[in-house]
Amino acid sequence: MNILILSGSPRRGGNTDLLVESFAQGAAAHHQVDILHVRDCKVGPCKGCNACFKSEGVCAQKDDMSYIYEKMNHADMLVLASPVYFYGLSAQLKTVIDRCHNPVRDTFHIKKLGLILVGAATLPQLFDAITTQYRLVLNFFHLEDAGMVLVRGAKDKGDVKEEQLKEAFLWGLSLV
């Protein structure tokens, strides 16, 4: 299985990156894993012009989204990874997701979706808004829920705990 991780953290070497690396190490035991850090891509927000619907999925914007579409086209599973900012995904990852409002998405072979989230707060509702959207996306695209790792109380670089990294690793290792 080809697994693409879209990592939405703007911070290099932070908690999201640590969890992504742990997951990827586990998953790489049985699968091909590709990590794409959206912070390294130049992607503008969707302009809602619908040019993509008139041109077989070709976006009017000339940026790195075409590269991301290509990566997504080769994936069997997609993992969205993000720090939580104001109960939502990072702006970088949300921008990429919004740009999937494009008919090119219908050519993707993605069958499974997973989620890695890390936030500084510890309240029980921290991930509710994102997991609600996640489940709506699963239903809309008829995707299998491959699982998730949700980490609370990790603000500064390295705050993620060893058992949380192990959880991400074991989730990756367990994928069939």
Please identify what each model-predicted range represents.
Residues 8, 38, 117-120, 151:
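Cofactor-binding loop segments of dinucleotide-utilizing enzymes, especially the Rossmann-like FAD-
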Residues 83, 153-154:
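Flexible loop residues that form catalytic
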